[in-house]
Amino acid sequence: MAYSHNAPFRADVVGSYLRPAELKAAREDFAAGKIDAAALKAVEDKAITELVAKQKAAGLHVITDGEFRRGWWHFAFMWGFNGVDHAAAAHRVAFHDEVTPADTATVTGRISGENPPFVEHFKFVKQFEDENTVARQTMPSPAQTRFVLTGNAAAYPYDEFYKNDDELTADIVAAYRQVIADLYAAGCRNVQFDDCTWTRLCDASVRERLGWSDEDALRLQQENLDVINAVIADQPDDLVINTHVCRGNFHSTWLSSGGYAPVAAKLFGEENVDAYYLEFDDDRSGDFAPLAEVSGDKKVVLGLITSKKPDLEDPDTIKARIQEAAQYIPLDRLCLSTQCGFASTQEGNKLTEDQQWAKIALVQSIAKDVWGE
């Protein structure tokens, strides 16, 4: 029996964890043809089983597979759709100080969501649920998938598979709804959309580099909102769908900067998720004022503990920031988490596993002091 409450939790996490050395080695061996898929899966299963035990020992109410079966947080999920495959990217994504490997996702047929591998991945984690934990399935948001597949003109020839972006978007929505229906049937009650599309619209330098005018930015906000809400529409009442709004997280570097104000009205006011996991770990994140736009009884998880650096934050400083956020949204609707995952890609951030768990212990300790739970 799973935990009787669902996310977000007062002490929470985004979901990805540093890959153990044994898993990294196995993935390299698989890529080199030294081991087969079954051997890789055996290593993954062992690593995930051990990770779940560590999450429980840390007192977390949410368990994930750490994204241990993925090299990328987003592409690896997209590649699981029918009609989407791996491709070499024409350009590497430039994070600050580093560039990513040259991977992307490309359309190779009509997109659909039947028989995705991630449902079996979820079932493996689901078996470890108990009276204190809920299994979470993370995935790139529908807007993220749409951005990747429409952002590269070579990604899909209109005349071969789709006449226009609207046709492609309709199939993305249908594919997500199929996957979520299958996850729900497998017992999933906590889905998390990870999304870097909104924060690109918050960064003037990114908008300039991509050639987006102010009108383009407003149009893209509406397109993001429409595709996400179309997937969420009419989902079961006991299925919690939250979103992590990310500024990029590759090897302790970042992709975009800027507060949430430019997108707050649409993102916080109109996106029909249950909660937002938001990054507030440094000066690039802006202030808390945009939280006043969070509508209804939606909750906000404050990502005040950075997952990019090993140094532990001062608890009193974090508590003061929580109280500052509570000026814009009631304290009872706030929670605390790490700012992002610890390994959005298999490279992982620049800290050790011990430092990773120390960060989570800090989240737990502060949450208990603030909310008593």
Q: Predicted segment positions?
A:
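Domain-level signal for soluble alpha/beta catalytic cores
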Residues: 1-373
